[in-house]
Amino acid sequence: RLKTIVPIVSDGLDDIFHSRMIMNFQENLATLPAIDHLSGLDVCDETGSAIHHIPAAPGKLGSLKLYHALAVEFNGRLNAAAAERGLVLFAEHVADAAAHPGKHPNIDLLVRVKNENLALQLRPLAANP
């Protein structure tokens, strides 16, 4: 059964939606690479300074897994295309983020990157052995 989500409207999303079934966030997470080797992920500006951090902590692991997948897929770049992909993967949480600004800062960041056409870097942080 297909799940309905509220997409961020964009020219590129039609191709994404037509190329595969629309899945919910948990289903999307199940398809992404493992993150057990990470302690977190930094989002960095053009100077390499961390402007956002996602820890490997309860309540943040889904976002960490999604952002790590974006780092892999987009070679460490967080640009409008990567942000669009991330918003598709966040699925039903995007509508909740739009209705409650600040409740989902990791989604808010993707919306900002997309809307402002930002070019940031994703830096996964290895866990200590």
Briefly describe each language-model feature range.
Residues F25, A50-I54, K65-A69, A97-H100, ...:
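N-terminal, charged low-complexity regulatory/assembly segments
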Residues E84-N128:
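Short, compact, well-ordered microdomains
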Residues I22-H37, H52-A57:
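N-terminal, charge-rich interaction modules
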Residues R1-V6, D11-I16:
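A cross-taxon signal for low-complexity, glycine/charged-rich
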Residues D42-A80:
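Amphipathic alpha-helical interaction modules
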Residues P33, L38-S49, R112-P129:
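A cross-kingdom feature marking charged/low-complexity
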Residues S19-R20, P129:
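Short intrinsically disordered terminal tails
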